[in-house]
């Protein structure tokens, strides 16, 4: 299903509620550039075999709601640019994501300029190697919750991970890289959820 609705920029509505996705392995760029979509119901998607979600919702500028609570991401390795340029999303619940196999989270939330909070408490980032531009231009983001599963040990590229995240506590435009991907009390931008 990679690129299935790629650059369907005139599309204002889309009924995909009857899609059988149980055998799908790739959803790269599936809705990329659907810039006029306001709502998109993917709540019934079976993603249990999907291994890559690169740019899946990238450029869905007007999307105001996205229910991903039933997404099974245990096989996914690539989440780069997954929500890139979802500028109208004010809320995004990804707390149920299994990220244990993910290696690439680069630009995952870039230009999600209305998001105020993200919950990574169930995120296992021990295999992630790329977090470049992950939160770039998330100007309203005030809180990023993490747990003890959060690890940057394998990351080799974290360039401008927090660039323009000016609402994060203690933000400094000179400090936007991996050195800030730690708890606030240790000099970073992240919050331990209690």
Give the residues covered by each predicted segment.
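Negatively charged
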Residues: 2-194
């Amino acid at each position: 299903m990679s690129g299935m609705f790629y650059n369907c920029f005139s599309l204002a509505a889309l009924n995909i509620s009857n899609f059988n996705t149980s055998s799908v392995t790739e959803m790269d760029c599936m809705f990329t550039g659907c810039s006029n979509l306001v709502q998109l119901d993917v709540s019934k998607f079976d993603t249990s075999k999907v291994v890559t979600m690169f740019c899946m919702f990238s450029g869905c500028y007007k999307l105001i709601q996205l229910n991903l609570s039933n997404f099974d991401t245990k096989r996914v390795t690539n989440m780069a640019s997954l929500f890139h340029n979802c500028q109208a999303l004010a809320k995004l619940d990804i707390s149920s994501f299994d990220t244990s196999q993910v290696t690439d989270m680069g630009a995952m939330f870039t230009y999600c300029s209305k998001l105020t909070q993200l919950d990574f408490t169930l995120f296992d980032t021990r295999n992630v190697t790329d977090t470049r531009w992950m939160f770039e231009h998330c100007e309203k983001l005030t809180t990023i919750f993490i747990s003890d599963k959060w690890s940057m040990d394998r990351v080799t590229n974290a360039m401008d991970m927090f660039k323009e995240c000016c609402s994060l506590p203690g933000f400094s435009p000179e400090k936007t890289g991996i050195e800030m991907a730690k708890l606030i009390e240790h000099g970073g931008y992240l919050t331990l959820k209690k």
